[in-house]
Amino acid sequence: PASLGQLSVAPVVAFGFTDPEPPAPITVQGSMLQVPEGHALSLVGGDITVQAHMFEDGTMQAANLLAPGGQINLLSVASPGEVLVPSSQTGPNINGASFTTLGMVTLKDGAMLDVSGQLGADAEGNPIGGNGGTVLVRAGQLVVDASFIQGNTVGAVDGERAAVDIQVSQKATLTNGSSINTITSGAGKGGDVQLTADTVTMENGASIVTATTDGDGVGGDVVLNVGTLSLMGGSSIQSQSQTFTPEGLGQGGNVIIQGLEGAGSAAKSVDLSGDSFLLSSSFGTGEGGRLAITSKSLTLDGAATTVNAEAADVGGGGDIAVNVQHASLSGGATIKTSTGSADPNAPVAATVTVQGLLGVGSMADSVALSGSGSGIVSDTQGTARSGDVAVHAKTVILTEGAVIQTGSSFNTGPGGNVTIVADSVDISGEARILSLSAIGDAGQVAITADALTMNNVSIESSTSSSGRGGNVELNVGTVSLSNGAKINSSTSETGRAGDITMNVGTLSLANGSEISSASIGTEAITNPDDGTIRAPGTAGNVVITAAGRFTSDASTIATSAEANHGGDISITAHSVQLSNGTLITANSNAPLEVKETVLIDGQLVEQVVGDGNAGNISVRSGSTYVMTNSSMTTEASRASGGQIAIITPEMVRVINGRVSTSVAGSANDTAGGNITIDPQFVVLQGAQIVAKAFAGTGGAIDIIATSAFIRDPASIVDASSTLGISGTINIQSPLQNIGGELAPLSDEFSSAAALLAQQCAARAAGGKFSTFVVAAREGLPAEPGGFLASPSLTAELLGSHHSGRDSYRPIAAVTGAFPEYEARPIQLAKLGSACHHQ
């Protein structure tokens, strides 16, 4: 009837709460609330709980809130204020009364918030994509317990920019398998997940996932603005690209963790443990997304705990950028990029960069890796090149088997580069820095630091194939290797080992440490398909330049080749000291001619590709060269020896040591290498300076000692040949063969008792005492070549007018003209009563 009233419904403009008491709670229990596609569903009040309903038979029915392609708004408040619609922002904060306190939102028992798009059809029956909507949560606390939030996109339309938008003023907790998902399965872009909270805790398998599947769509980003973030018990944050069709180029979204203020700010701490992980992955043709962490502290602990960017097919993995003050990885935890593609056109694996909070080029305070399996790694299991690893920190510590590594001994592609820039690098306990390749070239290892300490560890760049070993380059102030520490570049087949270049302040090797660039292959490689034969690889070079001292105790520097040319060794330092079995060697066990067989116009043709001569050794010292119980050799078993040159302005001293360029080959055209020694003094004690040959010609030994050449009878200088022509020995020195032998000064000292007795005897004889007289020199300067007076003298003035006071009075430094004073004796010793008992 016309007289009846009508109910009119208009869009809500705002939700207002004016009562000083907290708003009443809202509970959805086992119900399903759904709005039409594209519309909004809002719950605004006090604490909000979405949970299951338990029936009398004990079964549970989960609660569901559904808004396909629309919006779900959950706003929990605990104080007066106003919420505006549709923005869900708070109203003007008049007199500070707008929502000073927020409430709690709880999702549990399998609850679902879903704003996923629905695939439809147009008038002609063609499929139409459905864009995902937005889940918006505003609260003081959020608990998601065994429940789910999702906003998926299908088809060619884009999802909302933020599929999940959560802002919590205090703490957000996801637990017991809970998940937040946004997935795009067409050409449309997936929505982002944005979570802002002072504390975020994910535990017991909780996850946040964005993904793209079967299309060209770009996955949504995961952006966490947090104070602290903790992942425990297998929890994860993931961005995935799962595009498998050849035309599918869908790219995974990025994972970004930063401070509460957003871009450019740093979280207080990010902690992952118990097999939890951050993952950016590509499982098809699409590219993986980027992983970026900006936090004052990053802690990873546990064997399967990882920050990982991986590519399993031709798609490339995303890069990892970690900006921190302090980073700690332990118990097998890793920061890792990898690719497993067998496609030769697959892109380079992603890079890993750990640096300071200011980004590119800045330095973290500390990066510490400990425990077997812990590490920063870029790896490939296929043909693609491994990515690079860069660490910039004031202090870098690796211990207990931890690694910084690119490539592996299984990959067929080239290894990546390792770059470390630090104030100090401390490596101990079998830790390693590696660039490896099974078939391709190994990458470069470069360290720039004020100090590098290595204790029972290794730095290695090597390949086990026809590839080239990578170079190792150190630019370090102080370098110390001890207890078997190794710096190595090697090849074990036909490739050339890389070079090792060290520009340092001081270098110390001790207790079996080693610097080596070597070819360890022993035989030529035969190709069974065409019968061609490849020659074994050659050793690389070692170049050491030290502004200060170089010392080596019971250690090795080697550029040896088992079946090809040995590499060269060059050492330049202020002083050089070798002791206790130190070996510097550039030996070769190869034949005089290194040959291989190649296929030319269908014919196998043998050709010479090199010689098997030993490498050369050059040592230049700015002061002295001292070798004790050590060896320096460029010997060859079947070819010619290398050259050895020792150049220093002061002294070369060899004690029970060996300098040898001898050869043992049976060919008459093998020759011992030449030896050149050119200091001011040469001192040989039980030493061997030899350039001998068996069938060929002995080498030339040139010793130029501008002041003296001194050797004992046990020392040998020999350039003879057993069957061939002896070499030459040329010794130029104004002074040679002093005394026939060298002997140390006596270490027997006069008896103080005997000297005291003589003093007593002198006193008894006539009362005369030994005296020391200080007399002026009338201001004359010291004569040329004479001794200079001590700048400060003291004496006990006994028996003089100074006795009894100022017992130890310093005499002024001797400078300029002496003052005039009367020369008087100073009694040097007070015998006292000692003489009365003689």
Each predicted region: which residue ranges?
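Extracellular and secretory-pathway beta-repeat/beta-biased strand scaffolds
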Residues: 1-838
